[in-house]
Amino acid sequence: MKTQILALSVALATAGPAMAQPVNQQDLQTLTYADLADLGAGAPVVAHVRVRGAERLNAREATTVRPGFTRFEIEAEVAALIRGTGGLPERIRYLVDLPNDSRGRPPRIARRSEYLIMATRVPSRADEVRLVTADAQVAYSAAAADMLRGIVREASGADAAPRITGIGRAFSVPGNLPGESETQFFLQTADQRPISLTVLRRPGEQVRWSVALGEIVDDSAGPPQPNTLLWYRLACTLPARLPADVLSEATPEETQAIQADYRVVMDGLGRCARTRAPRR
């Protein structure tokens, strides 16, 4: 494959062939919903690609590569476009950083190996894309592709759950009966759309909590389903403990109730499991 200058690199020269060990790619069976949502929820381009050629860049051409990684220029054919307004050419090029093996040797990328990539477009270069992170390429599987399609479909909807930026305020109000209460948490979002969490306690009933997207709180609503975009926004963003400023105006009794109900929400959401550290 002929090496050309890419928008991600400066003055690429002819790169050496990709020899050494086969790629030690992360097993797709271990990738979680959060892993794929980290990469794909906001990516303008999501595609299933098949490698036509790979060239390894030397240290002079890849000065920003993390220790223990090697940068490659990939030429690939587009097998399927999952997201990408305006489409893509049949063949594209991009740069990717891949981990070296335990002996420090660069990986080998097999011709016709298949991947899922999450990327942005390169201005004025129709056949080039830039990965959203230097390693935003994962081995293809039908299960991972289906999960990504679901993430993209939800993220592209007009009613998509917004990105959460913090917790604005919280309050708890006791009911008329002993043990009865209602606690609400008002979340801050990137696009200023309201999200609120409500926890209801009633004597003799199981504690219930729900999430509302909008101004109207529906007591009959429930918590988000796991492995959905709304679940991801909450489980992978909300802090494990309430920030002190959220409780600054609460009485000691209210603070105790609010903290207990916040634990109900966090326990209900469960852990945001990741196998890779999100890179921004």
PLM regions: where:
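Repetitive helical segments and hydrophobic/amphipathic motifs
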Residues: A11-A13
